[in-house]
């Protein structure tokens, strides 16, 4: 279905409802298409600044939103400061990997330099930043894992670390089936947990070597940035399904990392 862009007024109306009905004082704009261009981003933050609403918020964006050097630097910096003025406290955008071959397999059409530039611009505005990386594509090696952690170190940012989980109806899912990594779909899907667990290894490394490389890279980055983290990757594995065999159709799968329960006053 085509993406239906929402106006700043429509977005603010929903924010106002959540504040008035649920007492919300923090909102997460999880849909990065809400900030698909600098123009739409500026329109939304100007609307927030001009409204009587006061709330803290975070947002997910594409790495090229503030990182594209073709856009005048002064304009990018100005809008970054407006984000802060409008109540934004954190911006997230994914690095995924620093290896060109893996990025191509991901079909990620964002230059690596854009990530570095986005970090620079947004930090000028005093914003907190978060990013995510994904390990486990077929061409992943100890070297590519190190390269990705080195890129994080270069930008002084600790990532949310995920392991590739091919999901149904994606190219990587079809790749995994065609190359013999997934031979029993029911077994794979019922034992699949979440992105911080190793559910399927499509690299040429053993499971132990693969996870050790990630742990070593995360540990070194943790020490280099002086974060003092105890849990480098996850806080605990989600239990796999233990019930009877599931019956599925194409609408069975909905993956949402931002779940919340609201209770009206």
PLM ranges: what are they?
Residues 171-176, 185-265:
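Radical SAM enzyme core and accessory elements
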Residues 130-131, 158-163, 223-231:
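Bilobed periplasmic-binding protein-like "clamshell/Venus-flytrap" ligand-binding domains
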Residues 1-3, 97, 139, 165, ...:
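Short, flexible micro-motifs
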Residues 1-130, 146, 150:
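Radical SAM [4Fe-4S] cluster-binding motif and immediate context
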Residues 138-150, 160:
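Repeat-solenoid scaffold signature
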Residues 156-182:
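Accessory C-terminal segments flanking Radical SAM cores
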Residues 32-36, 62, 135-139, 162-171:
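Short, solvent-exposed turn/loop segments enriched in Gly/Ser/Thr/Pro and often Arg
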